[in-house]
Amino acid sequence: MYFLTPILVAILCILVVWIFKNADRSMEKKKGEARTRAEARPWVDEDLKDSSDLHQAEEDADEWQESEENVEHIPFSHTHYPEKEMVKRSREFYELLNKRRSVRFISNEQVPMEVIDNVIRTAGTAPSGAHTEPWTFVVVKDPDVKHKIRKIIEGEEEINYMKRMGHRWVTDLKKLRTNWIKEYLDTAPILILIFKQVHGFVANGKKKVHYYNEISVSIACGILLAALQNAGLVTVTTTPLNCGPRLRVLLGRPAHEKLLMLLPVGYPSKEAMVPDLKRKPLDQIMVMV
C-alpha cells in the first residue's frame, strides 16, 4: 500500500496544476472578451471615468497643470438704469422668456448661420469655475449626420421607454404626448449638441482642472435658450439617455468631452402644437428672507 503513495501524490499534483491552468485560461478568455468589447466600443471605458472630483488633480499631480497665470484687472464699466427703466426692461425680458415653449414640431426652413454664431457667442459669456469655459458647442447641419444622430437616439429611447425609465416616468410623459420618435432631429435645420469638458489640456500636454464643469455648462445652456428665444427661434431640450458616448464618437469629439444636452433649432412648423401648461406663480418659486 505504501509504494502507491508517491503515485497518488503525483496524481494530486498534476490535478492541482491542471485546475490552475484551466482557471488561468478562463481568466485570459474573459480578459480577451473584455478587450474585444472595449475595442468594439472604444468610448465606454473612457466615458465611465467622467468625474468632476475636485481632488483628482491632487492625486495625480504629475498629470495636472497648476495655474500660474496672472490675470490683469481693469476698471468695470456699468450702465445704471433709472428705476422705471429697470422695471420696464425686466418686465419686457420676462414677457419674452415667458413665451418660450418646448417645440417638437420644427420646420425645415433654413436659419441664418450668423444668428447661430451670435447665440452661441452669447452662451459663451456664461460664468464658469475659475473661468475655464468648459464647453463645446457642436453645430450639425449635414442631413446625413442628423439622420445618424436620430437613429442612435431613437434606438436607445425606445429601450428607455420600454425598460429603463419605469412606469411612473413614462406615465408622466404621456400627458405631454412625447415618445421615442424624434422626427425633429431630421427636420430641424440645425442641431446643437452641447458637450461639457471634464478637464482641459495646456500647451505642455498636462491636464487642466475644470471646476464645476457640469454646473458651468448648464448655465451656458440656459443662456443659449434665452438667446434662441430672443432671436425668434424655437427648440426643445433633449438629454439623450445612454446615447452620449456613441454621439461623441460619431461627431469625433475627444474622450474628455461628455454630451450634456442636444437642441434642435429652427422655426416652428405651421402645424406646431404645444401643451397648455401653466407656470408656477412667483409666491411658489421665491422665498423672501
Swiss-Prot record:
Q: Which reaction does it catalyse?
A: 2 iodide + L-tyrosine + 2 NADP(+) = 3,5-diiodo-L-tyrosine + 2 NADPH + H(+); iodide + L-tyrosine + NADP(+) = 3-iodo-L-tyrosine + NADPH; 3-iodo-L-tyrosine + iodide + NADP(+) = 3,5-diiodo-L-tyrosine + NADPH + H(+); L-tyrosine + chloride + NADP(+) = 3-chloro-L-tyrosine + NADPH
Q: What is its EC number?
A: 1.21.1.1
Residues recorded as binding FMN, renumbered to this chain, are: R100, R101, S102, V103, R104, S128, G129, T237, T238, T239, R279
Segments of skewed composition (Basic and acidic residues): 47-58
Q: Does the keyword NADP apply?
A: yes
Tell whether Membrane is among the UniProt keywords. yes
Write out the similarity annotation. Belongs to the nitroreductase family.
Q: What job does the chain carry out?
A: Catalyzes the dehalogenation of halotyrosines such as 3-bromo-L-tyrosine, 3-chloro-L-tyrosine, 3-iodo-L-tyrosine and 3,5-diiodo-L-tyrosine. During thyroid hormone biosynthesis, facilitates iodide salvage by catalysing the oxidative NADPH-dependent deiodination of the halogenated by-products of thyroid hormone production, monoiodotyrosine (L-MIT) and diiodotyrosine (L-DIT). The scavanged iodide can then reenter the hormone-producing pathways. Acts more efficiently on 3-iodo-L-tyrosine than 3,5-diiodo-L-tyrosine.
Note the subunit structure: Homodimer.
Q: What is this protein called?
A: Iodotyrosine deiodinase 1
